[in-house]
A protein has these predicted regions:
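Short, contiguous alpha-helical
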Residues: 2-9, 16-91, 133-185
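Charge-dense, low-complexity intrinsically disordered segments
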Residues: 6-13, 17-20, 98-105, 109
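Acidic/histidine-rich alpha-helical segments that form the ligand environment
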Residues: 91-135, 143-156
Length: 185
């Protein structure tokens, strides 16, 4: 009998287990693609036609995790660590561009913490109202299921970006981490 790695979604799980498992797989794959790099590698604009960096993606997805699980899900404003970072009202590109000012340790901690916070908030919402529970975005017309699909879409896009960037930085390729790699979140 083989034991699936912690990022592998269940083969025959419930809808919640499948959705959360798919999201955790993308989170783990993204984190592995960005793992273990220094400032120069995280800030490397490895694709000439793009300003994207792995550091920028780490910070952007950390912001997305907290924004989806507060502003979009509950309507609440994001608190720390964002409140003390000078997050602008229109933060569309801020995570991408401001990451150059952060150390690798800060970026990894920011991302890992945001994943933990988002997971806790989503699991609490699931316990209280399930996938059909309304969320704050668009006046409650969205449900949690749709919010999770949007988060999966965001991760799908940026995990693909991270795949190309990491290969350009040091040649790392592949879909999954080694089986002994443990996601730090």
């Amino acid at each position: 009998m083989t034991i699936d790695p912690p990022w592998e979604p269940p083969l025959a799980g419930t809808e919640v287990e499948a959705l959360m498992g798919a999201l955790d797989r993308l989170r783990a794959t993204f984190r592995w693609k960005a793992d273990g790099l220094d400032s120069a590698a995280l800030g490397n604009k490895a694709i000439a036609s793009s300003a994207l960096t792995l550091g920028g993606l780490l910070k952007h997805l950390a912001l997305v995790e907290d924004y989806y699980s507060t502003g979009r899900m509950t309507g609440e404003r994001m608190g720390e660590p964002w409140a003390s970072m000078g997050l602008p009202e229109d933060a569309q590109d801020w995570g991408f561009t401001s990451a150059a000012d952060d150390s690798p340790e800060e970026l990894y901690a920011l991302y890992d913490g945001a994943v933990r916070r988002c997971r806790e908030r989503v699991l609490s919402k699931l316990d209280n109202s399930g996938l059909d529970g309304p969320v704050a975005v668009f006046g409650g017309e969205f449900n949690l299921r749709r919010l999770l699909f949007d988060l999966l879409e965001e991760y799908g896009r940026h995990t693909g970006h991270a795949d190309l960037l990491r290969e350009a930085v040091d040649g790392r390729t592949g879909e999954d981490p080694d089986s002994d790699w443990v996601p730090p979140f």
